[in-house]
Amino acid sequence: IHSCISGSAALPVDVQEKFEAVSGGRLVEGYGLTEASPVTHANFLWDVPRMKGSIGVPWPDTEVKVVSTETGEPVPIKEIGEIVIKGPQIMKGYWNRPEDTKEVLHDGWLYTGDLGYMDDQGYFYVVDRKKDMIIAGGYNIYPREIEEVLYEHPDVVEAIAAGIPDPYRGETVKAYIVLKEGSSVTEEEMNQFSRKYLAAYKVPRLYEFRQELPKTAVGKILRRMLVEEEKQKIKDDSQKHA
C-alpha cells in the first residue's frame, strides 16, 4: 500500500497513526460534500510536511472562507466559524427544493454546516458539524475533541460523544464506547482518563459501553440515532410517572 485517502467522517489521529504503522502506507484525510461534486479539500499524497487532523488545502479553483455563525463575516486565522465554499464543483441547487437551496447557497457560496478554522499555512480543520455542537451550561463543546481523547485510550475500539437533553444544563455530554474484547475498563476509569486531557466542562458526565454502535451502510457512526434514543428514554420515563 502506497497511499490511501479517508473521507465521509472525521479521521481520528490515533486511527491514522495505527493504520500507517500496520500498512506502511500513507493515509491522508480529504473533505467534501455531495453538494460539491464531492471534493473540495485534500492533503498531499506525496511526501510533504502535513498537519495531523487537517482536511488539507482547497482544490484548484476552489475558494474557501470561514465565517462567523452570527454575523456571516470572515473570522481571523485559527478562529472557529462555518466553512463556506465557492467553485466550479458547487451544485446549482437541490432538484425541486428551492427553500432548501436558499438555506445553503448565498451568492454562489455553499454554506457547509461544518465548523472549522484555517491555520497560518492555509490548512483547514473541521471541528464538528454545527448541528452536533453541544451546549452544556452555556459552554460550547465540540464532540470531535472529546472523541480524539477517547480514541487515545488503549482499550477503546470506537467512540462517539453526543449532547443529550438535560433539564438544568440544556445538554449533558455522554460518551458511547465500544471496548476491545475482554476489556474490563469501568466508567470511573474512563472518567479519570478523560480528566487528564480535557477541561472539566468537556469531560463526559455519562458513559455507556456497547457491543456496537449504529452505523450507516458505509460505516459512519449515527450520532443522531443515539440522541434520538436518549430522547425516547426521557419520553418513556415521563409517561411512566405521569
Regions found by a protein language model. Name each.
Residues 87, 92-93, 100-103, 115-202, ...:
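AMP-binding/adenylate-forming catalytic core of the ANL superfamily
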Residues 28-35, 55-58, 162, 208:
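Beta-strand->loop->alpha-helix junctions that form or flank phosphate-binding loops
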Residues 1-50, 63, 70:
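Gly/Ser/Thr-rich phosphate-binding loop
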Residues 52-59, 74, 104-108:
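Short Gly/Pro-enriched turn/cap motifs at secondary-structure boundaries
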Residues 8, 32, 56, 114, ...:
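Active-site glycine-centered loops adjacent to acidic/histidine catalytic or metal-binding residues
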Residues 228-242:
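Acidic/polar alpha-helix N-cap and adjacent early helical turns
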Residues 65, 77-91, 109, 115-116:
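AMP-binding/adenylate-forming core of the ANL superfamily
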